[in-house]
């Protein structure tokens, strides 16, 4: 099926300097609803800088970000989240001392009135809704009253992703979501990523694991020295080609580049 004509996210000529260093040089990127775009590149390629700009942690020196064709200015991470962009970083923003439900609703807790006067957290309803959400997403966390510190790495990752879904994310940026996970836990996270596509979420997926990239992504965008080096349709590529482009920043002569705008 052809993607919609208007991308959910359009990044146009994004440039970022740190002193005299140009970390990003006129980078362009489109992401459509219901697709996974892999963002690839070696260390120092510019991936982290780009996702921090999209997350509102940095502001670009040049260029613009558009959502649904509307130019956006994210001065803070809160601005980005209010625009529907959520980022799940490697260092998960979870509170180990709180339970699963409390983490899902952290910052947007449901309340009830005691004696119709005093507002109080409605823990019962939050746990009910948390159970329903995790069930709908097929997330394997049997008890929502369990402390997060007692969860496995895969469960913690799934919880952070589920929190973004509950907060009505439209674009989810996932930074190394399977790093340090075992085989079984990785499988569950990849299955969750695939299921999010059916919910029409747009996903930017950053990983050094090319096996995962080839399985879950629709397109691959490769950065090299702060520039967009290549864009490929994943099903038409393979591990050897992606490795070569990441290292050299170039495609073979027989392989046309889709876009280096």
Locate the predicted segments by residue.
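Glycine-rich phosphate-binding loops of nucleotide-dependent enzymes
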Residues: 2-261
């Amino acid at each position: 099926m052809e993607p919609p004509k208007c991308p959910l996210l359009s990044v146009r000529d994004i440039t970022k300097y740190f002193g005299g260093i140009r970390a990003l040089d006129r980078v362009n990127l489109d992401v459509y609803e219901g697709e996974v775009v892999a963002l690839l590149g070696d260390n120092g390629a510019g991936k982290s800088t780009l996702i921090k700009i999209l997350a509102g942690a940095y502001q670009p020196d040049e260029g613009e970000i558009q959502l649904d064709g509307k130019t956006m200015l994210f001065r803070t991470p809160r601005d980005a989240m209010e625009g529907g962009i959520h980022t799940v970083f490697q260092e998960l923003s979870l509170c180990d001392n709180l339970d699963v439900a409390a983490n899902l609703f952290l910052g947007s807790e449901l309340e009830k009135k005691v004696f119709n006067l005093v507002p109080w957290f409605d823990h019962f309803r939050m746990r009910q809704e948390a159970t329903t959400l995790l069930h709908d997403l097929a997330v394997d966390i049997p008890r929502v009253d369990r402390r997060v510190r007692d969860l496995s790495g895969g469960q913690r990752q799934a919880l952070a992703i589920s929190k973004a879904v509950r907060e009505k994310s439209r674009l989810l940026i996932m930074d190394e979501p399977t790093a340090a996970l075992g085989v079984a836990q990785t499988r569950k996270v990849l299955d969750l990523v695939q299921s999010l596509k059916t919910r029409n979420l747009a996903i930017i997926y950053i990983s050094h694991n090319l096996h995962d990239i080839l399985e879950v992504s629709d397109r691959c965008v490769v950065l090299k020295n702060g520039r967009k080096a290549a864009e490929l349709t994943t099903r038409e590529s393979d591990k050897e080609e992606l490795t070569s482009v990441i290292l050299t920043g170039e495609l073979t002569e027989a392989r046309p580049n889709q876009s280096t705008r």
